[in-house]
Every structure is written in C-alpha cells, then in structure tokens.
Amino acid sequence: MEAMSHSIRRSLQPFARSRRSWRSPARRAEQRWIHIQQLQSAEPGLVNGNYLPASTTANSASSPDAKFRVLGAPYSILSVTLSASQNLYTRRGTLVGLSGKADNVISTLSLLEPARRALLRIPFLYQKISSTSPITALISTRSAITTFSVVEMNGSVDWMIAQEKALLAWTGHSLRIKPRLTRQLSLSHWGNSEVTGRGLLALVGTGQLYSVELKAGEQYISHPSNVVAYTITAPSPRPYRFKSTILPFQIPSLGIGKRLSDSNFIKNLSDTDTWKAALKLWHIIRTWSRRTIWGDRLFLQFDGPATILVQSRASRMADTLTTQQVNEIADAPPGVTQDAVDRAAAKLGEEETVPKAKDDLKPTTAISGQSVASVRRDGKVEFHQTGVGQ
C-alpha cells in the first residue's frame, strides 16, 4: 500500500504543477512591482539664476560660557545653559522655567537705554539672570506663530537686526547692542539694532526662519517686510523695483497745458486752499494705490558677501516703507532705484548748503568801507569815508 500511495502521489505532481501554472496568470495580473529608492537632496548653489542657497537656520550655538539650543518642531522654545557668573538677558515675560539651585539665582529687571529705545519703538525692558552655579533656563514667546533662530557672534562679523522685536535674548560680556535710527523706513520701522562683539543671540521671526548665504558678486532680492537680520559687512541694501508691462499712449502736444498754466485764472486757483487740499488728497490716493496695488514690486537688493535671515510671514508694506520712499521707488525706472534716493539726498544737501553760503557772504557784504574821524581845533568832528567805496 505504501508503494502504491507513493506512486499515486508522484503521478499527481505534474497535474499539481500544471494547476499552479493555470492560476499563475491571474495572480501575476494582480501583482504590481514597486521600486523604492532614496532621492538625492538638491545642493544649494549660486543665487544668480541656477540655485537659491536658502536653508533652515541653526538650531544650536555654543560659547565657552553658554549654550543656546532650540527645541520643538517647529522651533517653539529655547533652552539656555549658563555657566557660573554668566549673565543672560531675556525679554520681560519670556522666561518659562529654570533648573538648578534656585537659591543661587539672581533675577533683576534691567532698563536698557529706555529713552532712545522708546523713541525707536524697540523693547527696553529685559530680565537679567545670573547665578553662582550652572543653570538651564527655558525661554519662549507669547505668540503661537513665531520660531527661533540662534546666531553665534565671534567678533569678526557684525549684524544688523531689521525688525525691532526680533531680538529675544542674548549673552556675552563683550556683546554690545546699540539702537540705530533708520530714517529711510517708516515710523514703525525706524528702530534697528546693531550687534557687535562676541556672544550668542536668540532671534524670533513670524512664521519660519531661513538663512540665505551670498558669496562675493552674488545678488539677492527680498521683500523688506521679510528681512529679519543681515550682516553689515556687505554694502547696505538698496531699493529695487521689478519691471512691468506698460502700454505707452502718445498724444500729440497741442500746447493746451502751457496755455492753461500761463492764465491768471489757473495761477489764482493754485493759490487757494481748495486746490491745495485737492492736491493733497490726490497725493494720498496715489500713494495708497502704489502701496496696495503695486506694492509687491517694491523689494530690497542685497549684494554679497552677506548672510540674510528671512521670515516666511511678513508685515504690511505700510509698516516698512515710508510715503516718500514708496513714491521715489515708483517714480524711478525699473531696476536698481538707488539713483532716485541719491538725487533726493543730493537735493537735501543742496538746500542745507545754500543757507550756509548766504551766512558766509553776510560779513563780507556788511564791511564795505572804512570811516576815519578827525577832530578839528574848533571842536567839530569830521568823518572821512575810505576803503572799497572810495
């Protein structure tokens, strides 16, 4: 029986193979081959046309006496490790917690140049934290859409903080932060901060922060509301306006405008308060339209070598550029509009030099001659005019 069953099994094997071969086409029809491979990340290169060397900012920085580390995804909290007798300055109300010996910690409220910073709309209330033993502090902001970035200052490169509320915390005995007045921007953006020395900085921006590295000879165009900070080794950023499609309409000149301007009616009308109010209203409407409708064409141009920190969310155009700067950029031809700014500065310089020249001419015109008095024997006094007038 065993031999018989073995022979039956061997005889059924070809049938089983053929049966499996019959089912294999249906199974092959249901199968899909998936090929998975790792993609190579794009390498940042030149900024002029080919690549954009933009990357995320550093999430940690260290010095011999302190260490800054950004935690969270997206970055939402800052961890600060301080050594003994090291000072930490953080904005008032941003300290979340602290670990270490609490009895050795000293916290005081510091007023950093309140007069100048208040005029420039820069925060001046900071909390100074120091300890005789090593501590670790956690710092955060009240806003839910801000992220952190840390900058290590080694003394070779100085930074300019473009946003007045971007500076959150810093440490370093030789670090110096000076408020700077930028009259080219609007009143809400007059205050910039120049940072020099050695130490660590903690900056905050709206949305996500990115770093753009420029080499020598490279250029980068950025919206002024998105710039958080930049190095000041390179030339100052210049206003820039993109080209647009314009359909010029040429109307033959008939001399009507010149005739109307020469008439007495137009001259008397231009001196009235109603005419001046109408011109002022037209100027306001034109500036508003340039900011609102054509505001996306107003940018800033940076020249390398430079490092620029930009934020993904920006403020309004009205909070960044003044009325005068918007009109100067809009009236200038497309491209680099530094010529318009230079002409405005030269005009202002000429107005200042003309009064000085007039003052210098006053002493020379006042002294036009010399009078000599002689007393006669009878007691009368005679005056004789001599000098230039003779």
Swiss-Prot record:
Q: Where is this region: Disordered?
A: 348-373
Location of this chain's protein in the cell: Mitochondrion
Indicate whether Transit peptide appears among the record's keywords: yes
Q: A Pfam family name for this chain?
A: AIM24
Transit peptide start-stop: 1-28
* Predominant place of localization: mitochondrion
Per the record's keyword annotation, is Oxidoreductase included, yes or no? no
| One Gene Ontology biological process | inner mitochondrial membrane organization
Query: Out of the domains of life, which is the source?
Result: Eukaryota
The UniProt regions of compositional bias labelled Basic and acidic residues, in chain numbering, are 348-362
Q: Which family does it belong to?
A: Belongs to the AIM24 family.
What PANTHER family does its record include? ALTERED INHERITANCE OF MITOCHONDRIA PROTEIN 24, MITOCHONDRIAL (PTHR36959:SF2)
Tell me what this protein is called.
Altered inheritance of mitochondria protein 24, mitochondrial
Q: What is the lineage of its organism?
A: Eukaryota, Fungi, Dikarya, Ascomycota, Pezizomycotina
